[in-house]
Amino acid sequence: MKTRTVLFSIAGTVLAFAALDAAVAFFATRDSLAGPLDLSNVSKIRVEGAASDIAISTASEGPHVAELKGERHGWGAVWHSGWYSDACPAQGSMRIEGDTLTVDVGRAARFFDWSDCTMELTASLRPEAAVIIDQQAARTRLAGDFSVVDIRSDAGDVSLRGHAQAISISGAALRAKVTFERVMQNETIAISGKMLEATLKFLTPTPVSYLVEAVASYVDSALPNTPGAKPEITIRGEMVHTRIE
């Protein structure tokens, strides 16, 4: 009987901790680390650091601003929000030099940190801005008209809807979805990754040229390959799945 009681007590404790852990998973605190900053005179954004969730848009009308936030999830968010004042992480920062906004999202969370921290960048700029991202991991959502989009990320999830004259996306494991709302016949698109899933969609029917180089590839194109035409698409990788429509 004593053995059974002990076993039930242990089982009850495990279930209680499991329930508490599940509840804490829904607990999050959000810290505003920097901004909003005025981007009226900014035409280029550069994002550095470990990892972040990025949303950048362009519009002729303002306000043109940027804000960096950190959102904590998990056990540490419960205690950290009430007892500590330092942000998530404290070294996340933004600075403007000339026409360039540089965003540093800081280091990745350590293995023994009590909470996971998601760095979130939101920005609105004037059309034809340039976006440069160099991170270990990034989820990037772009909407609007851009001059240059240059993204280097070991693990990346990229979506762009609008237009960009030059697109370069590279990394190890990538998923990219690019939707062109208009075409100027001067676009170049280069996407490369070891494991790559890429979808390119043109809302206006247009001739395109494309080159796919991969160890193993599956290319599904609704548009014929027209040598010399632009948009010019180059895709390289080891395992590649590409759709062009």
Predicted regions, residues:
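Charged, glycine-enriched surface loops/patches
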Residues: 145-147
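Transmembrane beta-strands of outer-membrane beta-barrel pores
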Residues: 137-139, 155, 173, 216, ...
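Fold-core signature of tandem repeat domains
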Residues: 140-142, 153, 158-160, 176-178, ...
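Acidic (Asp/Glu) and glycine-rich low-complexity loops/linkers
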Residues: 2-134, 150, 161, 168, ...
